[in-house]
């Protein structure tokens, strides 16, 4: 299939940069315009878009359309890609998550997780980066539709506690989506910008950002003064969020169902489990504003209806360990920043899960009764801050962003392995970035010809307990007794939090370096190129499928329009019975063919429409020649866009608005109706 470019060819190129909050469960996009941030709604009018991608026998769906059909197609609807990105298949968090996912995750090359789905009748494997790139592409398209321009540049946010490989993988996802990722920034830092942008000139303020989303949790402590945002410390858990609370509620309901129905276990039925999860998520949201919520699902499993009422107290009891755990990183950042809780001027809540009353209560109690700030929208704050940072990086001249300076930190210590497997740290965690640090190392044995530089991140004393980022050899060291050669190792971490390591042997000047592109989560340039091409191919397929559906709808509209006219008494009187029979026979045959050929090609539908028109158009045009264009038109109207007849008639057999029966119906679809191909989406209703 011909490759289709990711952005619409008729859109003018733009140097506008957008900010994208790529979330575990929902994503959000914003743009800086007219001294403010516009959060951009999607084609459904929602300001956040589910981070869901679904594959069917005919098409690929992204966002709301994917989430709406999840109960019918759980095995091929992928979500939570952010919980896989940059991780290994064997990690305990991945293994535990897999128990809750209806889709299949397999181990690929170098233990990279691969998501298996069935798409257009074939089994396909996708990297988590590819799924995330599809969500990013959707956000890019939303922005392009809103701005009427092609977008290339973006700032994407990640949890502050994402490690190097997770950051790299997120950057790769942006590249696959056809974006130039100008910067990866930390979510709590972006939220701090949203909070502090219009609060200048009020002296130094210490702000604690508490960001609890759908899948990740971050706490950052910042000092804001005169437009300078300086991160003092950050902590968190890249695997804690609303999804975990949903899981607890789902497990409770599975056990409750088992108890009420003689041990029947619905946990092996992915459709039942998905329907239950959807209702549990709704109940969780309800419990943020009500003290109880009822979960009711008809015919949940083996024809059995299920109903249970969950109180807020019961929900809190189910998740209390998770809720309490959120205070551990709060204590950690205060300790790291050497600050007392009384010194925190403002606690800012970000992320949908901070709406849970118990979490708000725990934070209030921890800060001795201090009310948390709720002046920013918890769902949109991160995208808002990312959009501001995008404006700064694209050189926006407006006063509001010109004086703003962001000083972020690296969230994990970086170092290398020295004799005995010891972790020697070069850059301590919470060091302001960008940062550069050098240290001299030497050889361990006489006449050692080379050294192996192994780079790690983490806080443990021994490297075996930390995360290996990458390694390289420096060879060609001249023979010398141990401890004589001098090897200078430099760690250079850029503003994206991505690391370069260089080693130089001082006497010869021989050097080697590595940009940490870590096998653990990083794709090779060849893989990225392939995925970029695949993304364009899928995009082209989506466009092709849209045109196919439009052609089908056009044919269907035409047939039912003619059928309804022929059944009208006033029109019947103007035609011979043989003419009515000829038309009806042709239309009935085509409608029967349509019923059996829902997946026919665009060309087949168009050919069938021409066939119908060649039979019906001459006969239908007679009616209007008889009336000579009298008002009233087609009584009863035609489904899909001609309610109440067509005032003004149709002189000469033509219909206004591109509906000329003798010449066919160009463009598919009828004026006044829903655009062809965008018919109502069917949502699951329990």
Swiss-Prot record:
Superkingdom: Eukaryota
Disulfide bonds: none
Gene3D superfamilies membership: 1.20.1270.10, 3.30.30.30, 3.30.420.40, Actin, Chain A, domain 4, Substrate Binding Domain Of DNAk, Chain A, domain 1
Stretch list, region Disordered: 657-686
One protein family per Pfam: HSP70
UniProt feature, compositional bias: Gly residues: 657-676
Keyword line: ATP-binding, Nucleotide-binding, Repeat, Stress response
Keyword Nucleotide-binding tagged: yes
Residue spans of the Sequence repeats: 632-635, 636-639, 640-643, 644-647, 648-651, 653-656, 657-660, 663-666, 668-671, 672-675
Residues of the signal peptide: none
Family annotation (CDD domains): ASKHA_NBD_HSP70_HSPA1 (cd10233)
SUPFAM superfamilies: Actin-like ATPase domain, Heat shock protein 70kD (HSP70), C-terminal subdomain, Heat shock protein 70kD (HSP70), peptide-binding domain
InterPro entries: ATPase_NBD, Heat_shock_70_CS, HSP70_C_sf, HSP70_peptide-bd_sf, Hsp_70_fam
GO molecular function: ATP binding; ATP-dependent protein folding chaperone
Stretch list, region 10 X 4 AA tandem repeats of G-G-M-P: 632-675
Family: Belongs to the heat shock protein 70 family.
Identification of the protein by name: Heat shock 70 kDa protein
Provenance organism: Plasmodium cynomolgi (strain Berok)
């Amino acid at each position: 299939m011909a490759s289709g470019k990711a952005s619409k060819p008729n859109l003018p190129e733009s140097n506008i940069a957008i900010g994208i909050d790529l979330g575990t469960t929902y994503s959000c996009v914003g743009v800086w315009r007219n001294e403010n941030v516009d959060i951009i709604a999607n084609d459904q009018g929602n300001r956040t878009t589910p981070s869901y991608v679904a594959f069917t026998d005919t098409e690929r769906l992204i966002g709301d359309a994917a989430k709406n059909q999840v109960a019918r197609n759980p095995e091929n609807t992928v979500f939570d890609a952010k919980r896989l990105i940059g991780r290994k298949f064997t990690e305990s968090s991945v293994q535990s998550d897999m128990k809750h996912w209806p889709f299949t995750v397999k181990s690929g090359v170098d233990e990279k997780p691969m998501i298996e789905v069935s798409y257009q009748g074939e089994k396909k494997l996708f990297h988590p980066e590819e799924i995330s790139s599809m969500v990013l592409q959707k956000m890019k398209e939303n922005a392009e539709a809103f701005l009427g321009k092609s977008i290339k540049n973006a700032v994407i946010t990640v949890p502050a506690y994402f490690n190097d490989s997770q950051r790299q993988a997120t950057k790769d996802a942006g590249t696959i989506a056809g974006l130039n990722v100008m910067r990866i920034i930390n979510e709590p830092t972006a939220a701090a910008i949203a909070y502090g942008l219009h609060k200048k000139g009020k002296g130094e303020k210490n702000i604690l950002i508490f960001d609890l989303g759908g899948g990740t949790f971050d706490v950052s402590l910042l000092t804001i003064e005169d437009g300078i945002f300086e991160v003092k410390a950050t902590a968190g858990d890249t695997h804690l969020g609303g999804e975990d609370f949903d899981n607890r509620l789902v497990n409770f309901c599975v056990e409750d169902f088992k108890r009420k129905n003689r041990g029947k276990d619905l946990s092996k039925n992915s459709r039942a489990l998905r329907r239950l999860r959807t209702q549990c998520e709704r109940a969780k949201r309800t419990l943020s504003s009500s003290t109880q919520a009822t979960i009711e699902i008809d015919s949940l499993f083996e024809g059995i209806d299920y109903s249970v009422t969950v109180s807020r107290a019961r929900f809190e009891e189910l998740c209390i360990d998770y809720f309490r755990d959120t205070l551990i990183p709060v204590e950690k950042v205060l300790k790291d920043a050497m600050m007392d809780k009384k010194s925190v001027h403002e606690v800012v809540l970000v992320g949908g899960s901070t709406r849970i009353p118990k979490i708000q209560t725990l934070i209030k109690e921890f800060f001795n009764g201090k009310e948390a700030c709720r002046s920013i929208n918890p769902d949109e704050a991160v995208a808002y801050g990312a959009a501001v940072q995008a404006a700064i990086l694209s050189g926006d001249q407006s006063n509001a962003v010109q004086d703003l300076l962001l000083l972020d930190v690296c969230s994990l210590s970086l170092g290398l392995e020295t004799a005995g497997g010891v972790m020697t740290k070069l850059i301590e965690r919470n060091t302001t970035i960008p940062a550069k640090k050098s240290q001299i190392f030497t050889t361990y044995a006489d006449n050692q010809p080379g050294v192996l530089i192994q780079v790690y991140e983490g806080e443990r004393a021994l490297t075996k307990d930390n995360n290996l980022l990458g390694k390289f050899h420096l060879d060609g060291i001249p023979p010398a007794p141990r401890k004589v050669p001098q090897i200078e190792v430099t760690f250079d971490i850029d503003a994206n939090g991505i690391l370069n390591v260089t080693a130089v042997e001082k006497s010869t000047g021989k050097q080697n370096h590595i940009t940490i592109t870590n096998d653990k989560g990083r794709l090779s340039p060849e893989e990225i190129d392939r995925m970029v091409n695949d993304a364009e191919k899928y995009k082209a397929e989506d466009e092709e499928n849209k045109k196919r559906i439009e052609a089908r709808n056009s044919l269907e509209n035409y047939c039912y329009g003619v059928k309804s006219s022929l059944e009208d008494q006033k029109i019947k009187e103007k035609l011979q019975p043989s003419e009515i029979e000829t038309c009806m026979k042709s239309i009935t045959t085509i409608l029967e063919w349509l019923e059996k050929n829902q997946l026919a090609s665009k060309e087949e539908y168009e050919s069938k429409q021409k066939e119908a028109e060649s039979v019906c158009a001459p006969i239908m045009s007679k009616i209007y020649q008889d009336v000579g264009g009298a008002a009233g038109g087609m009584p009863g109207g035609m489904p899909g866009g001609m309610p109440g007849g067509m005032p003004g008639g149709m002189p000469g057999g033509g219909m206004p608005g591109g509906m000329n029966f003798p010449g066919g119906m160009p463009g598919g679809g009828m004026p006044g109706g829903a655009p062809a191909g965008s018919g109502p989406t069917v949502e699951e209703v329990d």
